[in-house]
Amino acid sequence: MLRSRPARCWRILHTQRDRLSIRALHSESFVHNPPPWRPVSALDEYVERQIRPISLRQLTFFGRTLTESRLLSSANYVRTELPTRLAHRLRDIQKLPYVVVANPHFSLVYELYYKAFERFRTVPEIRTLDDNDRFCDILRKTLKEHLVVIPRLAMGVLECRGLLPADAMDQFMNTLLRARISRRVIAEQHLALTETFNSPWHFPGSQDRTDLNADFVGEVFLKCNAKEVIERCGKLVQDMIRQSSGSDKIPEISVQGHLDATFPYMLSHLEYIIGELLRNSIQAVSERYQGLQQTPPPIEVLICEAPQHVIMRVSDQGGGIPREILPYLWSFTKGPHSKVRLENLGQVPAMAATLQELSVSSEIKHADKETFRESSLDTLTSRPPDLRLGIGLPMSRVYAEYWAGSLELHSLEGYGVDAFLQISKLGNKNEQVTTRAAIDAV
């Protein structure tokens, strides 16, 4: 089920203005000014509060029967939860050495987070639909402002990699990204519920005010079919690589196993992970067989459905991962190509971490318009598909582990790579806001 046409048109009209404002924030923020002094005690009240995690099942059950009362309850949950989650991450940044916090990229992120914290904690209780509309405007504004966070964090950890142990910096980055996902999930879910409530096909007089057979409840896709997502993402990635490289050695994608496996999930999260795994495999095979006569072997994807999980194995014959890169595969800070990664990240003013933000031709975008669910942020960010940032796999693991899944890679040098993605099938696992390493340390 796609978003209503008026909503899409509204986004198109505002795309150019929003892109300009994001670029302005990106360029102006390189002029680094000392942050204003703030009392540490301002955060104390919210740091002492416990984060209230949610599961996909809770999001689904809450949004199925959407009434005005439930919509306002959702708004007030987001209103109180966002400053709490922001406060915990602000305190984490405050605990870093000053020389790290003074980095202009980290300083910008800190200022954005503190500004959002002050903004949300001063929002009064939401009692009416008009209050909710004003709150949604605040959410959209903040989501747009924070599109610069991922590239800035990535540049910050690369520039500060000699100031803290690499493992500590990676864990810090993982925690901030996981928390960022958590905030965007609850914010975008509420925006989607509000859009559903205000849509013309939503009837106020009915007891159950949403379609029980709808594929989406807010941003939660109830019938996520692994085979369909793989084939859809695979076609988009094949077209992107063919367009960017001009290569005719693009391998086919073979999908086998439990082809009917379905599960509830955030579609944009799964598309990002699958897209990244397929992109790496297709690029490796295409480069290995470029200039050779034989047809490149296919990328083989096996889907296995277990009682509580769905496991996907992506196998390629692209020659494996070079030995000098393998130890740094999941790191945001380490690796032999850190300097190149830093230069490439400087070309990315904003990033939503979705598959759709990769720049492709207008023909491909038009062809996939009705097959990919449109995000409210997709039109605000774009980057060339061949621009290597070095954060795709670490970011994919963050997405996978966020809903209590996992992502592992096994490389056979000289042959290829097997990637294993495990997804919780039942949707009953709470979001993993805290990293496993942090939990173990408690």
Regions found by a protein language model. Give the residues of each.
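Short acidic-aromatic loop segments in the C-terminal HATPase_c
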Residues: W330-K334
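Conserved ATP-binding N-box helix of the HATPase_c
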Residues: L236-M240, S244, M266-P297, A306, ...
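Flexible, glycine-/charge-rich segments associated with ATP-binding catalytic modules
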Residues: S21-Q58, G63-S73, Q94-P97, T128, ...
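Signal-transmission coiled-coils
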Residues: W37-E252, L267, E271
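ATP-lid-like helix-loop hinge signature
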Residues: N280-S315, R341-H366, T371, S375
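Conserved catalytic submotifs in the C-terminal HATPase_c
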Residues: I250-A261
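N-terminal chloroplast transit peptides
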Residues: M1-T15
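Glycine-rich G1-box
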Residues: G319-G320
